[in-house]
Amino acid sequence: MDKLFGTDGVRGKANEHPMTAEMALRIGAAVGKYFRRDGSAAHRVVIGKDTRLSGYMFENALTAGLTSTGMNVLLLGPVPTPAVGLLTRSMRADLGVMISASHNPACDNGIKFFGPDGFKLSDQAEEEIEALIASGVDAVEANDIGRAKRIDDGRFRYIERLKTSFPRQRRLDGLKVVIDCANGAAHRVAPEALWELGATVIPVGVSPNGKNINEGCGSTHPQFAADTVVAHGADVGICLDGDADRVILIDETGKVGDGDQFMALMAQRWAERGKLANNALVATVMSNLGLEHFLSDLGLKLERTAVGDRYVVERMRAGGFNLGGEQSGHIVMTDYATTGDGLMAGLQFLAAMTQSEQPASVLLNRFEPVPQLLRNVRFAAGQTPLEDARVKAAIAAAEADLSGKGRLLIRKSGTEPLVRVMAEHEDQTVMEQAVDSVVEAVADAVGGT
């Protein structure tokens, strides 16, 4: 059997391997077996989902698999991914499951898991679960089948946790906030939380129909929110993705700020207050060199990891760091959450606005980014373009052209069949030529796929 787990659980197109109802049933049974190894009858799991049409299918299939092995299932309905991590801990569950493909289109879906501590499962745990899927799992006796129950107040519990992360002496009165929920899991939670804190809320992307998640809106399409900010004269825009674990911020002029600018702001503010653990920020290899230079000038360190918020979190836990994230908008603040939380990060930015009395355009302009270019090349199943001699030669030549004054990063996506080619260099022309040469070689290697 091919490897199921990628960098963020199991993901693919709905009704195609591995994202079929049959496979979800097998995954549920294997996970149930894994967490019932000690034979206890008290094990429970919480399941959340985003707003994709296929979410109902996978919710039922997973529930069937889990209960067939004696697990008791608590169904949260549509909630953000970070809410699942939170409620797994607060409801004393052994496992949390989120059904979502995050920022991907509605035709995709995915399944990701959280352990009893609210953090994503380790690679070792996923490997053991895959082995159980391959070998098959026996169902329990009829009297030992687990129960399934819907939990109606999950989103309200999450809203209360969000509000406790916001300074108690502060309100958002007078702030006009555009919140783009990507027609996803936060379409009710986010506007409600902002309204309860006193903001004037302009909600967009809050009309999910099962097929429009991330469609022309949310963190992958921030221009929609940017246009709304300008049209309404708003102070700031907050763009979430389909499961609300990432955020992109918009200033009052409509300019888009990425995760690097937000992390720079929070690292600076936390360091000034003695709150930044180990005076360091954890980010991935995709974060801009400008961020690294900015932190260095402040006497702070940048710890880089592989791409994926799970690797950021693993490094944070191993090194005792409390702030990390990705340029794409996954922001992890372990003082408040166990995983990337777009809405939590957005609230921390609003707190910075109210405390500093500075506009978003100032707060999101911490450093001048080094020019960066990212291009993707799609490949077909079974192809290994990075092993092609032509591609290796093009990469070596491009690295030589950058002459140690920039960066070249080539990697396969962990969630899609893409080769990502990224370069940074102060000379735009040199950077573009380096990327073009590698992209051309990869495209040739895959036959223009």
From Swiss-Prot:
Keywords: Isomerase, Magnesium, Metal-binding, Phosphoprotein
Modifications the protein undergoes after translation, according to the UniProt entry: Activated by phosphorylation.
Cofactor needs: Mg(2+)
PROSITE patterns the UniProt entry points to: PGM_PMM
Note accompanying the cofactor annotation: Binds 1 Mg(2+) ion per subunit.
Sample GO molecular function, one term: phosphomannomutase activity
Residue positions where Phosphoserine is found in the record: 102
Catalytic reaction annotation: alpha-D-glucosamine 1-phosphate = D-glucosamine 6-phosphate
Enzyme Commission number, as recorded: 5.4.2.10
Positions that bind Mg(2+): 102, 241, 243, 245
Any one cellular-component term (Gene Ontology): cytosol
GO BP terms, alphabetized: carbohydrate metabolic process; peptidoglycan biosynthetic process; UDP-N-acetylglucosamine biosynthetic process
Active site per the UniProt annotation: 102 (phosphoserine intermediate)
Family matches, as InterPro entries: A-D-PHexomutase_a/b/a-I, A-D-PHexomutase_a/b/a-I/II/III, A-D-PHexomutase_a/b/a-II, A-D-PHexomutase_a/b/a-III, A-D-PHexomutase_C, A-D-PHexomutase_C_sf, A-D-PHexomutase_CS, Alpha-D-phosphohexomutase_SF
Keyword rRNA-binding among UniProt keywords: no
Family that this chain belongs to: Belongs to the phosphohexose mutase family.
Physiological role: Catalyzes the conversion of glucosamine-6-phosphate to glucosamine-1-phosphate.
Name this protein carries in UniProt: Phosphoglucosamine mutase
Natural source organism: Roseobacter denitrificans (strain ATCC 33942 / OCh 114) (Erythrobacter sp. (strain OCh 114))
Lineage, opening ranks: Bacteria, Pseudomonadati, Pseudomonadota, Alphaproteobacteria, Rhodobacterales
